[in-house]
């Protein structure tokens, strides 16, 4: 049973470096579509902007790690051209899980939960998670998170 996320920051940093390490800035006006993301990267010599919100309940102890994960994820959007809509996020979650296996099965499942799992939650509730830690622990421990939607 998984109880915490110790060591996750180092793994996120290694994955970010291994898969592109695209420079990024944290910005409330981050792109939310593939065309906007492509334009942003083109205008800024490869730098992308990522959304800063939602870090309060993230599984990462430091918001900077959450942002680094987001930068890696958005870079994957840029590379694959998979959309920011629910089907695109679920598809990208599957794709990112497949490449995250390089850093271990647990990290790959965390990546899948962070992307596809949260997209599935949003599709079911119409809202973002209020408690990412509880959701991720239940997801990874194979709890029936669908039955506990109000918990998150």
For each predicted feature, which ranges?
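Anionic, Ser/Thr-rich low-complexity intrinsically disordered regions
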Residues: 1-152
């Amino acid at each position: 049973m998984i109880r915490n996320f110790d060591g996750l920051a180092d793994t996120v940093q290694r994955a970010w470096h291994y898969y592109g390490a695209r420079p990024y800035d944290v910005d409330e006006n981050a792109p939310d579509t593939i065309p906007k993301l492509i334009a942003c990267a083109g205008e800024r010599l490869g730098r992308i902007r990522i959304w800063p919100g939602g870090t309060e309940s993230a599984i990462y102890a430091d918001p900077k790690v959450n942002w680094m994960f987001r930068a890696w994820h958005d870079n994957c959007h840029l590379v694959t051209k998979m959309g920011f809509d629910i089907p695109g996020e679920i598809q990208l979650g599957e794709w990112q899980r497949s490449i995250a296996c390089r850093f271990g099965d647990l990290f790959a499942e965390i990546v899948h939960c962070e992307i596809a799992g949260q997209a599935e939650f949003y599709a079911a509730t119409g809202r973002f998670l209020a408690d990412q830690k509880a959701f991720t622990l239940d997801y990874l421990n194979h709890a029936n998170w669908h039955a506990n939607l109000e918990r998150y």
